[in-house]
């Protein structure tokens, strides 16, 4: 063994540290932070050399990604060189359909289907003011603080929902106004089923109301339709489907919705 390979000789003789793999993994994980720090702090000639090296790495990575993507595309997009004769211009677009074109067309078709699929029964709803939605709750020893709000509309919270500590809870969702199930009507079958709510997809009033799970007229909710036995074209059972609320839950005391099919 050459004299300058004493490190390899030591490894072969005594082995590595017990935590070598863990230290190596952590060092590789920190590499991104080190590179980012160097990019911000280096100056002068070292900064130029660093930028040049990073540029070369990025160019190589882009070439590698491009080559990988081109390898996935099936079918010749250009005539083969060994054929001996070139195709005329009017036949250039008559090559064998490749996977990229098929994927592109399928994505466009899915977008069109999605646009047709969600034609909601209530396209417009009346706006609700914050004064109507939230009730101010006075807090503090002398009831002088008014930073808490209580939602006056019906809401949906998930199964694993836990309230925050009382002193830090800014928005209160009363337990008496929480809904877990909805009366969902299937427009084609003409039947109404009492189905559990899975989540609130979109509240037309505000994204904040969507996040809070407020149930108002026109809200799109996701319901569990496994009881209906709906099946996709591929033979899979449909688990969740969207429905739109058609009534005022805070007035009626229940949630009525129409399934979007």
Curated annotation (Swiss-Prot):
Q: Where is the composition biased (Basic and acidic residues)?
A: 17-37
Nuclear localization signal 2, short sequence motif: residues: 51-58
Q: Which InterPro entries match?
A: NSA2_fam, Ribosomal_Se8/biogenesis_NSA2
Under Pfam families, the record lists: Ribosomal_S8e
The alphabetized list of GO BP terms reads:
maturation of 5.8S rRNA; maturation of LSU-rRNA
* Ranges spanned by the short sequence motif Nuclear localization signal 1, renumbered to the chain: 11-18
Q: How does it assemble?
A: Component of the pre-66S ribosomal particle. Interacts with NOP7 and RRP1. Interacts with RSA4 (via WD repeats).
According to its UniProt record, which protein family does this protein belong to? Answer: Belongs to the eukaryotic ribosomal protein eS8 family. Ribosome biogenesis protein NSA2 subfamily.
Q: What is this protein called?
A: Ribosome biogenesis protein C3_06160C_A
Q: Supply the source organism for this entry.
A: Candida albicans (strain SC5314 / ATCC MYA-2876)
């Amino acid at each position: 063994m050459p004299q300058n390979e004493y490190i390899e000789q030591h490894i072969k003789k005594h082995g590595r540290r017990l935590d070598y793999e863990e230290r190596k993994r952590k060092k590789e994980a920190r590499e991104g932070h080190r590179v980012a720090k160097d990019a911000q702090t280096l100056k002068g000639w070292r900064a130029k050399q660093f930028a040049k090296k990073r540029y070369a790495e990025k160019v190589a990575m882009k070439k590698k990604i491009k080559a990988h993507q081109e390898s996935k595309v099936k079918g010749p997009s250009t005539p083969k060189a060994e054929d001996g004769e070139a195709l005329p211009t009017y036949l250039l677009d008559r090559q064998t359909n490749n996977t990229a074109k098929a994927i592109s067309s399928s994505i466009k078709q899915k977008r069109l289907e999605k646009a047709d699929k969600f034609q909601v029964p209530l396209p417009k709803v009346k706006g609700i003011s914050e004064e109507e939605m939230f009730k101010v709750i006075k807090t503090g020893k002398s009831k002088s603080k008014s930073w808490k709000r209580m939602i006056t509309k019906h809401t949906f919270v998930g199964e694993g929902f836990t309230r925050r500590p009382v002193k830090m809870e800014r928005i209160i969702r009363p337990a008496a106004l929480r809904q877990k199930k909805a009366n969902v009507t299937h427009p084609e079958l003409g039947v109404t089923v009492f189905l559990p709510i899975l989540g609130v997809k979109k509240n037309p009033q505000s994204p904040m109301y969507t996040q809070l799970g407020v149930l108002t007229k026109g809200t799109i909710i996701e319901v569990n339709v496994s009881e209906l036995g709906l099946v996709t074209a591929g033979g899979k059972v449909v688990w969740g489907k969207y429905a739109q609320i058609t009534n005022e839950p805070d007035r009626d005391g229940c949630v009525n919705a129409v399934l979007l099919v």
